[in-house]
C-alpha cells in the first residue's frame, strides 16, 4: 500500500499504435531522475494509478509539451456498468488560479481531481499486456494532438488519507479538556 506516500504505485504510458505499455513508476519517483516521454501521438495515454484514492498529481516537466485538448478520464464503478468516465479537472476552478486554465504539460504544475462520483478501484485491462494486475484507483489522460511531446522527471500525488477528519483534529488537539466534551 502507498498510504501517506507522495508516490504513485503505477505511472504508465500506453502507445495506442504499438498497443504497448511503458512502466515509468520507478523513474517518476526520483527527484531529478531520468526523464521519460508521455505521449508519442494523439490518443496515447498517461495512466496514473494508486491503491489509495488521491486528489492531486504534480508533474515536474523537463521538456515543455505542446498538446491539443486533453481528455481526462477516471474509472467509474457506476451501478454495475464499470467504465471510463470523462471529467474536467478542478484546478481551473481554484481560487488564486488567476488564469483559470487547466494544466496542459507546458510547464511544471499540478492537476486536481475533486468531483469523481463512484470512482472505484479495479485492475486496469486494455490489451492484455498491462505491467501488472493490481487493483488501483486510475486516472488517465490523452491529448487530441501532439506537436511536442512533454517529458517529465517526476510525478507526485496527494492521497486522500493525507487529511485529518474533524474527530482526529479534536483528539490531536486534545479539545475535550477545553470544550467539556468526552
Predicted regions and their residues:
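Exposed low-complexity, polar/acidic, P/S/T/G-rich flexible segments that act as propeptides
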Residues: 2-19, 134-162
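Beta-sandwich interaction modules
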Residues: 45-49, 96-146
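A short beta-strand element within beta-rich, extracytoplasmic domains
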Residues: 50-72
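Conserved short "hinge" loops at termini or chain/domain junctions
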Residues: 1-7, 78-84, 156-182
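Short, polar loop/linker segments at the starts of domains and inter-domain junctions
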Residues: 20-32, 179-182
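Predominantly extracellular/luminal regions of secreted and cell-surface proteins
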Residues: 1-25, 76, 91-102
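Contiguous beta-strand segments within globular domains
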Residues: 29-58
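Non-cytosolic beta-sandwich-type ligand-binding/adhesion modules
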Residues: 66-119
Amino acid at each position: 500500500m502507498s498510504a501517506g506516500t507522495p508516490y504513485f504505485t503505477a505511472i504508465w504510458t500506453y502507445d495506442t499504435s504499438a498497443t504497448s505499455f511503458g512502466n515509468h513508476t520507478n523513474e517518476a519517483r526520483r527527484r531529478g531522475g531520468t526523464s521519460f516521454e508521455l505521449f508519442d501521438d494523439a490518443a496515447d495515454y498517461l495512466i496514473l494509478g494508486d491503491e489509495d484514492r488521491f486528489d492531486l498529481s504534480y508533474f515536474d516537466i523537463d521538456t515543455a509539451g505542446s498538446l491539443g485538448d486533453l481528455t481526462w478520464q477516471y474509472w467509474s464503478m457506476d451501478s454495475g456498468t464499470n467504465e471510463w468516465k470523462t471529467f474536467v479537472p478542478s484546478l481551473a476552478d481554484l481560487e488564486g488560479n488567476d488564469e483559470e486554465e487547466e494544466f496542459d504539460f507546458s510547464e511544471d504544475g499540478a492537476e486536481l481531481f475533486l468531483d469523481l462520483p463512484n470512482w472505484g478501484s479495479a485492475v486496469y485491462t486494455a490489451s492484455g499486456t498491462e505491467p501488472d494486475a493490481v487493483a488501483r484507483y486510475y486516472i488517465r489522460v490523452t491529448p487530441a494532438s501532439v506537436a511536442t511531446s512533454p517529458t517529465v522527471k517526476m510525478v507526485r500525488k496527494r492521497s486522500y488519507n493525507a487529511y485529518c477528519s474533524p474527530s482526529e483534529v479534536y483528539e490531536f488537539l486534545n479539545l475535550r479538556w477545553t470544550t467539556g466534551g468526552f
